[in-house]
A protein has these predicted regions:
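Juxtamembrane membrane-water interface segments that cap and precede transmembrane helices
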Residues: 43-58, 126-128, 191-204, 304-317, ...
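TM-adjacent membrane-interface loops and short helices in multi-pass inner/ER membrane proteins
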Residues: 207, 417, 421-469, 484-488
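Alpha-helical transmembrane segments of multi-pass inner-membrane proteins
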Residues: 2-38, 63-78, 107-119, 139-155, ...
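Interfacial loop-to-helix junctions that mark the boundaries of transmembrane helices
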Residues: 51-63, 97-100, 133-134, 315-323
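Hydrophobic alpha-helical membrane-insertion signals
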Residues: 39-83
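Transmembrane alpha-helix boundary signature
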Residues: 75-97, 117-128
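Non-cytosolic membrane-interface motifs at loop->transmembrane helix junctions
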Residues: 129-137
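Helix-to-loop transition at the C-terminal end of transmembrane segments
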Residues: 42-46, 123-125, 179-189, 302-304, ...
């Protein structure tokens, strides 16, 4: 009896800590991306969002620090104010809290490299606080990333509420992005912006590249959850959010999210080929997502084709009739999979004897809704062949045939200094910087968020592309290579891959774990052509931390204590 009471007290003592982290995660997935600075005006309704974009990066940076700081202080206060009995019970789990996984060690190594890089930097203040006109990615922000990671990985517990509210908040952000894409400004955030910024800012996220990054880290969550939702209203929520997210991606003016989404869908299509029910739901969601692009045609017609600048891919997906081909294919696959799964389920419910019509004699068998492994292997080989063909074409037209006119595809298939809105220039010069660095700087970099100083010798050359300076390489991995060196980049790659791999290994039966893994994959892919910043990267850190949290809870040694593994 006493043992039972102790266990109940222990669980009660843990519940406030988990409740704090639940609120923290919800705030980071709803309040944080929705937040825009509000100013007071002299006329009704006395509140204005017109200045929201002028300091959006600093505002969200400050909000993240504040939310994380409040969560840390709350956890400390909960521990300090525990009564002696609860504190004694909580010590039982102290060893588990202090246990380090391979992901934990990589995260600590990443922070340690950032600290060493800051100490060795010639620009210590910038390395610590971050470049004010850059991305605020200094040691201070990295420290708060570490704190957020530790909070989530130690105290997070899965809740169905979290992906639901995330979907609701993201749907609002997506809808605003779609409206802003056609110069419809319901929040009046573009009133005081110059034309250039009106074209490149959107929704409550800011720059279109940041919007693409946000879609990359959120949309995969809803696509995966739409395959898991048991109730129709919940599934409708995730499918609606997915469709709005796809439309927002087409209106964002940036291709990085399309790249990440394509890789994610390819991987999960192959993975779900082993489960016909999941594959059917995935194809249904994909069909509706693709069909939703037709709504943009109606919006375009209603606004007289008055929209922001679109990329070649986005223009084709919205205005070209070829989009009907994948829509029809996905719809046909959905219908075929529906018929197959229904037929298999009916076969599983068969009479005990051929001559019996009594329902009481029905034998309930688990329907076989899996394809042979050979089918999955064949799909994987086909995907690899497609990827190899694309990469082969990229290498061929970049290194061998550099003269053939590729038209609009040249921006995609021919790498040179002009490639990817002159990202090629940033990358080529960045590798020259790394090559010419001494051993210490190769290992630890120039200091966090000091890319501006490292790249300054090339500013004169950069003017031919219309820029006078830059604070980022427009490739997260190259950026880390220059700022925190090879050691920092290696630690970062180990951390994000470790979180995803461990979640897949130990918690893959949980659909929310699968959703967070999808977010990590999609973000990691789009990061090849995008940048880390305090607007969307904190959300990625939270979702990657959830991967590790669920892996910790579902490891074999803890399988008797978890309540949600495999659900």
């Amino acid at each position: 009896m006493n043992e039972t009471n102790n266990n109940n007290q222990s669980q009660a003592g843990d519940s406030p800590q988990k409740a704090v982290i639940k609120l923290f995660v919800i705030a980071m997935l709803t309040l944080f991306p929705l937040f825009l600075c509000v100013t007071f005006s002299g006329s009704f309704p006395f509140l204005s969002l017109s200045d929201g974009f002028f300091s959006i990066r600093h505002d969200k940076y400050t909000l993240f620090l504040a939310l994380t700081g409040i969560a840390v202080i709350a956890e400390i206060l909960l521990f300090v104010t525990q009564n002696p009995q609860d504190r004694q019970n909580s010590r039982i789990n102290l060893r588990e809290l202090l246990r380090l996984s391979i992901t934990d060690m990589a995260v600590f190594a990443f922070w340690l490299v950032c600290a060493v890089s800051t100490l060795l930097s010639h620009y210590t203040e910038t390395a610590f606080f971050g470049e004010p006109n850059g991305r605020n990615n200094g040691l201070l922000l990295m420290t708060f990333y570490l704190l957020a990671y530790l909070l989530v990985t130690r105290f997070f517990e899965e809740s169905k509420l979290i992906p639901r509210v995330f979907a609701g908040a993201s749907a609002i952000i997506y809808l605003l992005a779609v409206l802003n894409g056609f110069h419809i400004d319901p929040l009046q955030t573009f009133v005081y912006l110059r034309d250039h910024f009106v074209e490149t800012f959107t929704s409550t996220i800011g720059n279109i590249d940041m919007m693409s990054s946000f879609i990359s880290v959120s949309l995969p969550v809803f696509v995966v959850m739409s395959c898991a939702a048991g109730k129709k209203p919940e599934r409708a929520l995730y499918i609606s959010a997915s469709s709005l997210g796809f439309m927002a991606l087409l209106c964002s003016g940036s291709d990085s999210g399309i790249l990440g989404l394509a890789v994610f869908l390819l991987i999960y299509f192959i993975a779900y080929s082993q489960n016909l029910m999941k594959l059917r739901r995935l194809m249904l969601t994909l069909t509706i997502m693709l069909a939703s692009s037709r709504l943009l045609l109606l919006l375009s017609a209603a606004t007289g084709d008055y929209h922001k600048e679109l990329s070649v891919i986005q223009t084709a997906l919205i205005y070209s009739n070829f989009i009907y081909i994948p829509i029809v294919i996905c719809a046909a696959l959905t219908a075929a999979l529906y018929l197959i799964t229904v037929k298999k389920c009916r076969r599983a419910l068969s009479p005990a004897s051929p001559n019996s019509s009594d329902n009481n004699n029905l034998v309930h068998k688990k329907p076989n809704l899996k394809l042979p492994k050979a089918a999955t292997i064949a799909l994987g080989c086909l995907a690899l062949a497609v990827i190899a063909a694309v990469l082969g074409a990229f290498v061929y037209f970049s290194a061998i045939d550099t003269k053939t006119d590729l038209g609009s595809l040249e921006k995609l298939l021919r790498f040179n200094e002009r490639w990817g809105t002159h990202r090629g220039f940033f990358w080529i010069k960045s590798f020259e910087i790394f090559k010419s660095s001494d051993f210490i700087h190769k290992l630890f970099g120039m200091g966090p968020d000091t890319f501006y100083y490292a790249f300054s010798p090339y500013f004169d050359e950069l003017t031919k592309y219309g820029d006078s300076s830059t604070t980022a390489a427009h490739n997260e991995y190259i950026n880390y290579l220059i700022t925190i060196g090879a050691a920092g980049l290696a630690a970062y790659l180990c951390a994000i891959s470790g979180a995803a791999v461990r979640a897949f290994k130990y918690a893959r039966e949980s659909m929310f774990a699968q959703a967070c893994i999808a977010a990590v994959i999609c973000y990691a892919v789009q990061a090849f052509v995008n940048i880390a910043q305090p607007i969307t990267t904190p959300i990625f850190i939270i979702l990657a931390s959830i991967c590790e949290a669920m892996a910790r809870s579902c490891e074999p040694r803890l399988i008797t204590t978890t309540k949600y593994c495999g659900k």
